[in-house]
Regions:
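Mature extracellular/passenger domains of Gram-negative fimbrial/pilin and adhesin proteins
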Residues: 2-9, 24-183
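Bacterial N-terminal signal peptides
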Residues: 13-24
């Protein structure tokens, strides 16, 4: 068995080379068909090493609690910014780029492989103001050096799932990328 697998892999590799040769030969005769563009920028702050990934554990939340209260209390998390240079930017706006919940616009949808259904994850300021995903937040004033921006994340039941008692229990996760815009 091992010998057959090895021979098949070698002959497949050889066929791959044969198919690539005509493509390579034609691309040698082409003129300037690949261009690279970009911009090198200086950011006002950096995210310290080890702080790039923010993981938040909600623990166990009962569907009965969500049927009664619609949402959980916020769980605090922090964005750490370091080496802030105010000559580059004195303010920062945050955008959480993520898949938006259809049942709760502005909140993060759960990942497709989540067992739980009928819920979404919301983000809010310490003053309880919603920070909708895919929208720019309010401005945060920066200080020279280190800055910490604190926010809350919460779980909320989708209205239809609450009315029809269709929140499904199970593990869940959601992911967002953070975009920082300095002014």
């Amino acid at each position: 068995m091992i010998g057959r697998c090895f021979r098949a892999a070698r002959s497949f590799g050889w066929r791959s080379v044969l198919f690539l040769l005509p493509v390579y030969a034609t691309s040698v005769n082409s003129q300037e068909n690949v261009h690279f563009y970009g911009a090198l920028t200086a950011d006002a702050c950096v995210i310290p090493p080890g702080k790039e990934l923010i993981s938040l554990e909600f623990g166990t939340v009962s569907s009965k609690f969500l049927y009664k209260n619609q949402r959980t209390q916020g769980h605090r998390f922090e964005l750490n910014l370091a080496d802030c240079d105010l000559s580059i930017g004195k303010m920062v706006k945050i955008t959480f780029l993520a898949t938006e919940s259809l049942g709760l616009p502005g909140l993060l949808a759960l990942s497709d492989d989540s067992e739980a259904k009928g819920i979404a994850i919301g983000l809010e300021t310490l003053g309880k103001k919603l920070v909708p995903v895919n929208n720019t937040s309010e401005q945060y004033e920066l200080q020279v050096g280190t800055n910490v921006i604190s926010l809350y994340a919460f779980i909320q039941g989708e209205p239809d799932a609450i009315v029809n008692k269709r929140i499904r229990e199970g593990g869940f996760k959601s992911t967002a990328m953070i975009e920082l815009n300095y002014e």
